[in-house]
């Protein structure tokens, strides 16, 4: 809806992302940077056989590697490398407020991670085919509804970050 267009409904389902403007405008939540992380991911294309050799995998096997500490310049968060059939998913997740306080640019972290000698060996000869970033809620909302509005998904903070895994899709389906 744009301009002077109007849309009317008895109930609106707000699935407008982690920083839900609808939830904020309805008075359900005031957003604080400390309640969010930023995840940045690259997909690096490599032949399946190269991935199997570099990660010591048999056909149809996969691997996941998780990192903390230096990869984020000690900013709370971590990094990951996951194998896919013909690509690697490589990324960094850090708390937004800590990133702001550190005065580090987010893209610098993923560049530095890629240039680590251990990671360079894994991605050598690969081609970046996708880059994405996503705001990740780190705190659940207490108010998920009000008259005529239901907040769901990331907008509702329905994600569990255990530090090793991020769970959210199962909650969306439940």
Predicted regions and their residues:
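Predominantly flavin-linked oxidoreductase catalytic cores and closely associated redox partners
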Residues: 1-124, 158
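FAD/FMN-dependent oxidoreductases across multiple families
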Residues: 73, 98-174
């Amino acid at each position: 809806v744009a301009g002077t267009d109007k849309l009317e409904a008895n109930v609106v389902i707000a699935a407008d992302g982690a920083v839900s403007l609808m939830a904020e405008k309805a008075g359900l939540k005031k957003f604080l940077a400390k309640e969010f992380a930023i995840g940045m991911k690259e997909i690096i294309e490599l032949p399946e056989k190269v991935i199997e050799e570099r990660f010591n995998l048999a056909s149809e096997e996969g691997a996941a590697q998780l990192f903390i500490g230096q990869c984020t310049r000690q900013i709370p968060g971590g990094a990951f490398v996951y194998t896919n059939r013909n690509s690697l998913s490589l990324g960094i997740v850090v708390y937004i407020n800590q990133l702001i306080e550190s005065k580090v640019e987010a893209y610098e972290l993923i560049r530095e991670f890629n240039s680590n000698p251990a990671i360079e060996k894994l991605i050598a000869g690969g081609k970046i085919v996708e880059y994405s970033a996503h705001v990740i809620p780190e705190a659940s909302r207490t108010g998920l509804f009000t008259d005529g509005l239901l907040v769901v998904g990331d907008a509702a903070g329905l994600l569990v970050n255990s530090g090793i895994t991020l769970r959210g899709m199962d909650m969306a389906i439940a």
